């Protein structure tokens, strides 16, 4: 038996879709023939022109980008509305955008809460009326294994805001479940992305990165496509009885390890 995601023709919204794991998610959903609306602070709408050339003949799925700051409730509402009007439906939303602040100054807490927490909250609020009309509605938030357990000292904004996302996933799964909307989180561990923090660490602190690699049971860093594949699964009918859960994509580093 061949497992099919049945995402052809679906409409997926992804925040932070121009680089790293967000970009990989756009790629994977396009390969599944789902149409994508993505956003980032800077968008050219040429980000995926080269990728389209790799799609099989007959795959006409496309991605349309919009530039705005996810910290703006009004911008989120406008984006969701215009995206729904463009394709007449919304089936999946993925809250992926994050400032990834590993610092703990007041401005870092404020921006992290505005994007990681309230950006997720407002995206769900704006999209729910459309998701209620979908036969395969799915909400996914990109959290982190740092939202699950202690990571580092001194205290920083990133981990607690990611923990708030995980709590909200549990609340939403109970509230939206009767409406046929599934809600789940993905918590990546050390993922090596072009332009991402682990690429920077690899350049600035290669010995430290090697120490961390050896702490991972699988003895390697993850890749963005490995996270995107989980997003595709959670968005698809293959995960039709999965809601309120947090999928760790971290090579096993959460099992009793500390950085």
UniProtKB/Swiss-Prot annotation:
Q: What is its main location?
A: cytoplasm
CDD domains attached to this UniProt entry: SDR_c
GO molecular function terms listed in the Swiss-Prot or TrEMBL record: oxidoreductase activity; oxidoreductase activity, acting on the CH-OH group of donors, NAD or NADP as acceptor
Application in biotechnology: Patulin was originally used as an antibiotic and specifically trialed to be used against the common cold, but it is no longer used for that purpose since it has been shown to induce immunological, neurological and gastrointestinal effects. Genotoxic effects of patulin with dose-dependent increase in DNA strand breaks in brain, liver and kidneys have been detected in mice. However, more recently, it has been proposed that patulin might also have anti-tumor properties.
**Gene Ontology CC, one term:** cytosol
**Catalytic residues, chain numbering:** 143 (proton donor), 144 (proton donor), 158 (proton acceptor), 162 (lowers pka of active site tyr)
User: Where in the cell?
Assistant: Cytoplasm, Cytosol
Q: Which reaction does it catalyse?
A: isoepoxydon + NADP(+) = phyllostine + NADPH + H(+)
Q: Which InterPro entries match?
A: NAD(P)-bd_dom_sf, SDR_fam
Q: What is its EC number?
A: 1.1.1.-
Q: State the top-level EC class.
A: oxidoreductase
Pathway assigned to this chain's UniProt record: Mycotoxin biosynthesis; patulin biosynthesis
Q: Which GO terms describe its biological process?
A: patulin biosynthetic process
Query: Which positions in this protein are listed as binding NADP(+)?
Result: 96, 125, 158, 162, 191
Keywords (A to Z) from UniProt: Cytoplasm, NADP, Oxidoreductase
Which superkingdom does the taxonomy of this entry point to? Eukaryota
The family annotation for this protein states: Belongs to the short-chain dehydrogenases/reductases (SDR) family.
Q: Function, please? A: Isoepoxydon dehydrogenase; part of the gene cluster that mediates the biosynthesis of patulin, an acetate-derived tetraketide mycotoxin produced by several fungal species that shows antimicrobial properties against several bacteria. PatN catalyzes the conversion of isoepoxydon into phyllostine. The pathway begins with the synthesis of 6-methylsalicylic acid by the polyketide synthase (PKS) patK via condensation of acetate and malonate units.
Protein name per its UniProtKB record: Isoepoxydon dehydrogenase patN
Q: Which organism is it from?
A: Aspergillus clavatus (strain ATCC 1007 / CBS 513.65 / DSM 816 / NCTC 3887 / NRRL 1 / QM 1276 / 107)
Q: What is the taxonomic lineage of the source species? A: Eukaryota, Fungi, Dikarya, Ascomycota, Pezizomycotina
